[in-house]
């Protein structure tokens, strides 16, 4: 038996929305350069970009696995794997990101809706504390904007709020859900500052410069 729809469900992206993933990438680059040298660093990011083009999402561990097939006897690669898995993601949460989740919970269910691989992205959600903060309501797809029918099955609602740093994703979801969706564009991270992004995809319903500014927004009209 299907669940009755809630008045509103709040969906949050992870990377550069709740968590500073640009900083994570910088830390990985610095670690590779410092401990493994420029050649390893350059090759890793070359493979990473190739894999992102193939898969449509960032796969840090997948890039390492593919690198390993080219350098099977390089034992340093195993240490890189341990470093990635044990990365302190909680230290990279944006200020007031957990407060923003709690703020929205006053009006409805709060969930994570993210893209990524099946290992590193869930690990990121868990070690950052986001998994617990949303009561395990975590959905991770390859292209989340193509999975909205499944999102509706898991979290049926009369209205949705999507908080994301990518206008492209918000615009694609708006085309599908229309007036049932309120889009919130968080201008954090490199994607949010691409030249001409708002002209290309149109403005979101709400635009904020940082996730903490969500605390000043009242969504009570969505949950009468």
Model-based region annotation:
Residues 1-46, 69-70:
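Active-site neighborhood of HAD-like aspartate-dependent phosphohydrolases
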Residues 1-7, 126-162, 166-224:
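Asp-based, Mg2+/Mn2+-dependent phosphohydrolase catalytic module
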Residues 11-13, 113, 162-163:
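Generic enzyme active-site microenvironment
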Residues 18, 110, 162:
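Conserved SAM-binding loop
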Residues 24, 35-38, 48-85:
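A metal-dependent, Asp-based hydrolase signature
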Residues 62, 82-112, 145, 149:
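Short, acidic loop-to-helix structural element flanking the phosphoryl-transfer center
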Residues 94, 114-116, 166:
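Helix N-cap/beta->alpha junction signal
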Residues 101-111, 115-139:
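Substrate-recognition/cap helix-loop segment adjacent to the acidic, metal-dependent catalytic center
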């Amino acid at each position: 038996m299907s669940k009755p729809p809630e008045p509103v469900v709040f969906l949050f992206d992870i990377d550069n929305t709740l968590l500073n993933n640009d900083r994570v990438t910088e830390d990985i680059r610095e670690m590779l350069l410092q401990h493994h040298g420029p050649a390893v660093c350059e090759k890793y990011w070359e493979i990473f970009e190739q894999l992102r083009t193939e898969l449509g999402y960032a796969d840090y561990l997948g890039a390492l696995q593919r690198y390993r097939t080219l350098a099977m006897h390089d034992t340093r690669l195993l240490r890189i794997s341990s470093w990635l898995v044990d990365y302190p993601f909680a230290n990279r949460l944006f200020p007031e990101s957990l407060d923003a989740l709690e703020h929205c919970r006053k009006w409805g269910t709060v969930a994570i809706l993210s893209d990524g691989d099946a290992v590193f992205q869930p690990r990121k959600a868990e070690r950052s504390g986001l998994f617990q903060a949303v009561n395990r309501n975590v959905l991770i797809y390859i292209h989340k904007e193509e999975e909205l029918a499944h999102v509706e099955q898991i979290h049926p609602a009369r209205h949705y709020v999507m908080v994301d740093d990518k206008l492209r994703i918000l615009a694609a979801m708006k085309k599908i859900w229309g007036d049932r969706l309120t889009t919130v564009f968080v201008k954090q991270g490199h994607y949010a500052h691409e030249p001409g992004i708002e002209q290309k995809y149109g403005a979101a319903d709400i635009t904020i410069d940082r996730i903490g500014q969500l605390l000043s927004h009242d969504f009570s009209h969505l949950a009468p």
